[in-house]
Curated annotation (Swiss-Prot):
GO terms for molecular function: DNA binding; DNA-binding transcription factor activity; protein dimerization activity. This is Transcription factor BEE 1. PROSITE patterns: BHLH (PS50888). Its main location: nucleus. Disruption phenotype: No visible phenotype. Redundant with BEE2 and BEE3. GO terms for biological process: DNA-templated transcription; positive regulation of shade avoidance; regulation of DNA-templated transcription; regulation of phenylpropanoid metabolic process. SMART domains: HLH. One of its GO terms (cellular component) is nucleus. Keywords: DNA-binding, Nucleus, Transcription, Transcription regulation.
Length: 260
Protein backbone atom coordinates (compact mmCIF):
# COMPACT_ATOMS: atom_id res chain seq x y z
CA UNK A 1 0.00 0.00 0.00
CA UNK A 2 2.84 2.35 0.77
CA UNK A 3 4.37 1.44 -2.55
CA UNK A 4 1.13 2.35 -4.33
CA UNK A 5 1.02 5.70 -2.56
CA UNK A 6 4.59 6.36 -3.64
CA UNK A 7 3.62 5.44 -7.19
CA UNK A 8 0.65 7.80 -7.09
CA UNK A 9 2.84 10.66 -5.90
CA UNK A 10 5.37 9.87 -8.64
CA UNK A 11 2.59 9.76 -11.24
CA UNK A 12 1.27 13.13 -10.14
CA UNK A 13 4.75 14.64 -10.35
CA UNK A 14 5.27 13.17 -13.82
CA UNK A 15 1.84 14.40 -14.96
CA UNK A 16 2.60 17.91 -13.77
CA UNK A 17 5.94 17.81 -15.62
CA UNK A 18 4.23 16.65 -18.81
CA UNK A 19 1.54 19.31 -18.48
CA UNK A 20 4.14 22.06 -17.96
CA UNK A 21 6.11 20.90 -21.01
CA UNK A 22 2.97 20.83 -23.16
CA UNK A 23 1.98 24.30 -21.96
CA UNK A 24 5.42 25.65 -22.88
CA UNK A 25 5.14 24.08 -26.33
CA UNK A 26 1.70 25.65 -26.78
CA UNK A 27 3.06 29.07 -25.83
CA UNK A 28 5.74 28.70 -28.48
CA UNK A 29 3.21 27.69 -31.16
CA UNK A 30 0.39 30.19 -30.58
CA UNK A 31 0.06 30.93 -34.31
CA UNK A 32 -0.73 27.31 -35.14
CA UNK A 33 -4.51 27.05 -35.51
CA UNK A 34 -4.61 23.29 -35.20
CA UNK A 35 -3.22 23.32 -31.63
CA UNK A 36 -5.40 24.73 -28.87
CA UNK A 37 -3.50 23.78 -25.76
CA UNK A 38 -4.46 26.92 -23.86
CA UNK A 39 -7.59 25.12 -22.66
CA UNK A 40 -5.82 21.79 -22.30
CA UNK A 41 -6.77 19.84 -19.19
CA UNK A 42 -4.90 16.98 -17.58
CA UNK A 43 -7.97 14.81 -18.06
CA UNK A 44 -7.82 15.03 -21.90
CA UNK A 45 -7.11 12.07 -24.16
CA UNK A 46 -3.44 12.84 -24.93
CA UNK A 47 -2.56 13.43 -21.29
CA UNK A 48 -4.32 10.22 -20.24
CA UNK A 49 -2.49 8.17 -22.84
CA UNK A 50 0.85 9.65 -21.82
CA UNK A 51 0.03 9.12 -18.17
CA UNK A 52 -0.93 5.47 -18.73
CA UNK A 53 2.14 4.75 -20.82
CA UNK A 54 4.45 6.29 -18.25
CA UNK A 55 2.63 4.48 -15.45
CA UNK A 56 3.12 1.14 -17.17
CA UNK A 57 6.83 1.79 -17.67
CA UNK A 58 7.23 2.73 -14.03
CA UNK A 59 5.45 -0.41 -12.90
CA UNK A 60 7.63 -2.57 -15.08
CA UNK A 61 10.88 -1.11 -13.78
CA UNK A 62 9.78 -0.44 -10.22
CA UNK A 63 11.53 -2.72 -7.72
CA UNK A 64 9.41 -4.91 -5.56
CA UNK A 65 6.51 -5.09 -7.96
CA UNK A 66 3.76 -7.13 -6.34
CA UNK A 67 0.41 -8.60 -7.46
CA UNK A 68 -1.39 -6.09 -5.28
CA UNK A 69 0.22 -3.25 -7.10
CA UNK A 70 -0.69 -4.86 -10.44
CA UNK A 71 -4.29 -5.13 -9.34
CA UNK A 72 -4.26 -1.53 -8.22
CA UNK A 73 -2.81 -0.53 -11.54
CA UNK A 74 -5.48 -2.45 -13.46
CA UNK A 75 -8.23 -0.90 -11.38
CA UNK A 76 -6.71 2.52 -11.91
CA UNK A 77 -6.44 1.98 -15.65
CA UNK A 78 -10.04 0.72 -15.85
CA UNK A 79 -11.20 3.75 -13.91
CA UNK A 80 -9.30 6.02 -16.26
CA UNK A 81 -10.75 4.26 -19.30
CA UNK A 82 -14.27 4.54 -17.90
CA UNK A 83 -13.65 8.21 -17.18
CA UNK A 84 -12.39 8.61 -20.73
CA UNK A 85 -15.56 6.98 -22.09
CA UNK A 86 -17.73 9.24 -19.95
CA UNK A 87 -15.85 12.28 -21.23
CA UNK A 88 -16.32 11.11 -24.83
CA UNK A 89 -20.05 10.55 -24.30
CA UNK A 90 -20.35 13.98 -22.70
CA UNK A 91 -18.57 15.56 -25.66
CA UNK A 92 -20.83 13.71 -28.09
CA UNK A 93 -23.90 14.85 -26.20
CA UNK A 94 -22.66 18.42 -26.18
CA UNK A 95 -21.99 18.16 -29.91
CA UNK A 96 -25.48 16.75 -30.53
CA UNK A 97 -27.25 19.36 -28.40
CA UNK A 98 -26.69 22.30 -30.83
CA UNK A 99 -27.76 20.06 -33.73
CA UNK A 100 -30.95 19.01 -31.95
CA UNK A 101 -31.67 22.52 -30.80
CA UNK A 102 -31.02 23.88 -34.29
CA UNK A 103 -33.28 21.21 -35.85
CA UNK A 104 -36.02 21.89 -33.30
CA UNK A 105 -35.63 25.62 -33.83
CA UNK A 106 -35.75 25.16 -37.59
CA UNK A 107 -38.87 23.00 -37.24
CA UNK A 108 -40.55 25.58 -35.03
CA UNK A 109 -39.50 28.36 -37.39
CA UNK A 110 -40.85 26.40 -40.37
CA UNK A 111 -44.16 25.87 -38.58
CA UNK A 112 -44.25 29.55 -37.66
CA UNK A 113 -43.51 30.51 -41.26
CA UNK A 114 -46.27 28.20 -42.54
CA UNK A 115 -48.77 29.62 -40.04
CA UNK A 116 -47.72 33.19 -40.88
CA UNK A 117 -48.03 32.45 -44.61
CA UNK A 118 -51.51 30.95 -44.19
CA UNK A 119 -52.61 33.86 -42.00
CA UNK A 120 -51.24 36.35 -44.50
CA UNK A 121 -52.98 34.63 -47.41
CA UNK A 122 -56.29 34.57 -45.49
CA UNK A 123 -55.99 38.25 -44.64
CA UNK A 124 -55.07 39.05 -48.23
CA UNK A 125 -58.07 37.09 -49.50
CA UNK A 126 -60.42 38.87 -47.07
CA UNK A 127 -58.96 42.23 -48.08
CA UNK A 128 -59.43 41.51 -51.78
CA UNK A 129 -63.00 40.28 -51.19
CA UNK A 130 -63.87 43.38 -49.19
CA UNK A 131 -62.33 45.62 -51.85
CA UNK A 132 -64.34 43.87 -54.57
CA UNK A 133 -67.57 44.27 -52.58
CA UNK A 134 -66.85 47.97 -52.09
CA UNK A 135 -66.28 48.38 -55.84
CA UNK A 136 -69.58 46.61 -56.59
CA UNK A 137 -71.42 48.89 -54.13
CA UNK A 138 -69.86 51.95 -55.74
CA UNK A 139 -71.02 50.75 -59.14
CA UNK A 140 -74.57 50.30 -57.82
CA UNK A 141 -74.63 53.73 -56.19
CA UNK A 142 -76.13 56.69 -58.07
CA UNK A 143 -73.58 59.21 -59.24
CA UNK A 144 -74.77 62.70 -58.32
CA UNK A 145 -71.80 64.60 -59.66
CA UNK A 146 -72.29 66.97 -62.57
CA UNK A 147 -71.05 65.47 -65.80
CA UNK A 148 -69.25 67.44 -68.47
CA UNK A 149 -71.09 68.92 -71.39
CA UNK A 150 -72.05 66.24 -73.84
CA UNK A 151 -71.28 63.45 -71.40
CA UNK A 152 -73.27 61.50 -68.85
CA UNK A 153 -72.43 59.42 -65.83
CA UNK A 154 -75.16 56.75 -66.02
CA UNK A 155 -78.75 56.12 -67.07
CA UNK A 156 -80.19 57.69 -63.91
CA UNK A 157 -78.27 60.90 -64.56
CA UNK A 158 -79.51 60.95 -68.14
CA UNK A 159 -83.13 60.61 -66.99
CA UNK A 160 -82.58 63.30 -64.36
CA UNK A 161 -81.13 65.62 -66.98
CA UNK A 162 -84.13 65.09 -69.27
CA UNK A 163 -86.53 65.81 -66.40
CA UNK A 164 -84.72 69.00 -65.46
CA UNK A 165 -84.72 70.09 -69.10
CA UNK A 166 -88.51 69.73 -69.22
CA UNK A 167 -88.90 71.70 -65.99
CA UNK A 168 -86.74 74.51 -67.34
CA UNK A 169 -88.80 74.61 -70.52
CA UNK A 170 -92.05 74.94 -68.54
CA UNK A 171 -90.53 77.70 -66.44
CA UNK A 172 -89.55 79.62 -69.55
CA UNK A 173 -93.15 79.38 -70.79
CA UNK A 174 -94.40 80.73 -67.46
CA UNK A 175 -91.89 83.58 -67.64
CA UNK A 176 -93.36 84.58 -70.97
CA UNK A 177 -96.96 84.46 -69.68
CA UNK A 178 -96.57 85.97 -66.22
CA UNK A 179 -95.81 89.68 -66.10
CA UNK A 180 -92.98 90.68 -63.82
CA UNK A 181 -90.86 87.56 -64.40
CA UNK A 182 -87.43 87.98 -65.89
CA UNK A 183 -84.77 85.52 -66.94
CA UNK A 184 -82.31 87.08 -64.54
CA UNK A 185 -84.49 86.10 -61.58
CA UNK A 186 -83.69 83.17 -59.44
CA UNK A 187 -85.80 80.06 -59.32
CA UNK A 188 -87.37 80.86 -55.93
CA UNK A 189 -88.19 84.49 -56.81
CA UNK A 190 -89.71 83.48 -60.12
CA UNK A 191 -91.89 80.85 -58.47
CA UNK A 192 -93.11 83.41 -55.91
CA UNK A 193 -94.11 85.79 -58.70
CA UNK A 194 -95.95 83.04 -60.54
CA UNK A 195 -97.82 82.01 -57.37
CA UNK A 196 -98.88 85.59 -56.67
CA UNK A 197 -100.08 86.04 -60.24
CA UNK A 198 -102.13 82.84 -60.14
CA UNK A 199 -103.71 83.88 -56.83
CA UNK A 200 -104.69 87.26 -58.29
CA UNK A 201 -106.23 85.52 -61.31
CA UNK A 202 -108.19 83.27 -58.99
CA UNK A 203 -109.55 86.25 -57.09
CA UNK A 204 -110.59 87.93 -60.34
CA UNK A 205 -112.33 84.81 -61.56
CA UNK A 206 -114.29 84.52 -58.32
CA UNK A 207 -115.34 88.17 -58.52
CA UNK A 208 -116.45 87.81 -62.14
CA UNK A 209 -118.39 84.66 -61.38
CA UNK A 210 -120.26 86.50 -58.61
CA UNK A 211 -121.17 89.35 -60.97
CA UNK A 212 -122.29 86.91 -63.63
CA UNK A 213 -124.53 85.12 -61.19
CA UNK A 214 -126.15 88.39 -60.12
CA UNK A 215 -126.64 89.50 -63.74
CA UNK A 216 -128.19 86.22 -64.77
CA UNK A 217 -130.68 86.29 -61.89
CA UNK A 218 -131.71 89.86 -62.80
CA UNK A 219 -132.21 88.91 -66.45
CA UNK A 220 -134.43 86.01 -65.51
CA UNK A 221 -136.68 88.29 -63.35
CA UNK A 222 -137.13 90.81 -66.19
CA UNK A 223 -138.03 88.11 -68.67
CA UNK A 224 -140.80 86.80 -66.42
CA UNK A 225 -142.27 90.38 -65.99
CA UNK A 226 -142.31 90.90 -69.76
CA UNK A 227 -144.20 87.63 -70.26
CA UNK A 228 -146.94 88.67 -67.81
CA UNK A 229 -147.34 92.02 -69.52
CA UNK A 230 -147.62 90.47 -72.95
CA UNK A 231 -150.26 88.02 -71.74
CA UNK A 232 -152.26 90.82 -70.18
CA UNK A 233 -152.11 92.83 -73.40
CA UNK A 234 -153.18 89.84 -75.43
CA UNK A 235 -156.10 89.23 -73.07
CA UNK A 236 -157.22 92.81 -73.35
CA UNK A 237 -156.96 92.68 -77.13
CA UNK A 238 -159.04 89.53 -77.21
CA UNK A 239 -161.67 91.08 -74.98
CA UNK A 240 -161.94 94.08 -77.24
CA UNK A 241 -162.28 91.85 -80.30
CA UNK A 242 -165.05 89.85 -78.68
CA UNK A 243 -166.96 92.99 -77.74
CA UNK A 244 -166.75 94.29 -81.27
CA UNK A 245 -168.00 91.06 -82.75
CA UNK A 246 -170.87 91.02 -80.25
CA UNK A 247 -171.95 94.45 -81.34
CA UNK A 248 -171.91 93.33 -84.96
CA UNK A 249 -174.22 90.34 -84.16
CA UNK A 250 -171.90 87.58 -85.35
CA UNK A 251 -171.45 84.56 -83.12
CA UNK A 252 -168.18 84.20 -81.35
CA UNK A 253 -166.50 80.77 -81.61
CA UNK A 254 -163.00 81.87 -80.75
CA UNK A 255 -161.59 80.41 -77.53
CA UNK A 256 -158.66 82.01 -75.87
CA UNK A 257 -155.58 79.86 -75.44
CA UNK A 258 -154.08 82.15 -72.86
CA UNK A 259 -154.38 81.30 -69.27
CA UNK A 260 -153.58 83.38 -66.32
Amino acid sequence: MANFENLSSDFQTIAMDIYSSITQAADLNNNNSNLHFQTFHPSSTSLESLFLHHHQQQLLHFPGNSPDSSNNFSSTSSFLHSDHNIVDETKKRKALLPTLSSSETSGVSDNTNVIATETGSLRRGKRLKKKKEEEDEKEREVVHVRARRGQATDSHSLAERVRRGKINERLRCLQDMVPGCYKAMGMATMLDEIINYVQSLQNQVEFLSMKLTAASSFYDFNSETDAVDSMQRAKARETVEMGRQTRDGSPVFHLSTWSL
